[in-house]
Amino acid sequence: MKTAWTRRSFLQSAALATATVITIAACGGNNQSSSGGSGQPVEVTLVSYAVTQAAYEQIIPKFAAQWKEKTGQEVRFNQSYGGSGSQTRAVIDGLEADVVALALESDINQIEKAGLIQPGWQQRVPNNGIITNSVVALVTQEGNPKGIKDWTDLTKPGVRIVTANPKTSGGARWNFLGAWGSVTQTGGTEEQALQFTTDIYKNVPILAKDARESTDVFTKGQADVLLNYENELILAQQKGEKVDYAIPPVNINIQGPVAVVDTYTDKHGTRKVSEAFVQFLFTPEAQAEFAKVGFRPALPEGVDPQLLAPFPKIQTWFTVADLGGWAKVQPEFFGDGGWFDKVQQAVAGR
């Protein structure tokens, strides 16, 4: 059926992009010019996660034109897109990014711990470094035959859910935290959250290793619900795909951070232009481009209200900070013996 093939085509290609690093040069030319002089071109290397590429294809030319007008200098961008976790490891292993825009604050914190980003990076930019927002969406098979609308529907007998293992997938961590917080952020206790999340994961026959495998399972009809990012589904619809999904009214704010990689900007002599680019990402002009491809703007002030209209209202929108922050959440939820392990133990006991 054409609709089913189209849906599979988009979702599988999106998952593949998240698993594969693709490097694109915005313009030709070899690096080693400093951002200090207005005559020579300067190159900036941006490393980001896959689903942001469509936005940066619009944002980068706007910034380049603005920089040229202000300084008289041409700026060229080398861009690398892939899964946030793999991009993080690549930078730590030697991919010399001037700017990183990743899916998790904890990913940037890993780069900081490797000594490449100076502590306090969140405080050196607006909005604590967060440039995009999104929420968890519940993708259903065509027509939503199981009537999935909210987190509680995931506990129904006979509902088959596919999500990745949060120990190996950053996106799956958001899914787990979204389900957990739907209890604790509405007055429930940790014990109640443990039971509720366990009931959900009892309906997850097999934990996929990553987003690609999760999507493969769903598109083959082996699951009723796929947990995914809202922005990816909006982008799919913009491309003409038919995707059925629901947005739980109690949801987690999936925040995308950005940071300058101090070690490499100093090495390349690109600090001034890199910092200017990061600042540009918080402007209404850049925020509008993120909104156009499905992200909820982190700073909606000044963004055309028509771009904000399609986003369903979230009744209770909580953040990782509400759960204690990544420094606490990572070990308590996903470390050895953490809440996820407790859920798995309870599921195994069935």
Swiss-Prot record:
* Gene Ontology cellular component list: periplasmic space
Which InterPro entries does this chain map to?
Answer: Sulphate/thiosulphate-bd_CS, Sulphate/thiosulphate_BS, Thiosulph/SO4-bd
Identify one Pfam family in the record: SBP_bac_11
Intracellular or extracellular location(s)? Periplasm
Question: Does this UniProt record's set of keywords contain Signal?
Answer: yes
Q: Name one GO biological process term.
A: sulfate transmembrane transport
Q: Which residues form the signal peptide?
A: 1-40
| Source species, domain of life | Bacteria
A molecular function (GO) held by this record is: molecular carrier activity
Family per similarity comment = Belongs to the prokaryotic sulfate-binding protein family.
Protein name, as recorded: Sulfate-binding protein
Q: What is the lineage of its organism?
A: Bacteria, Bacillati, Cyanobacteriota, Cyanophyceae, Synechococcales
Gene that encodes the chain:
sbpA
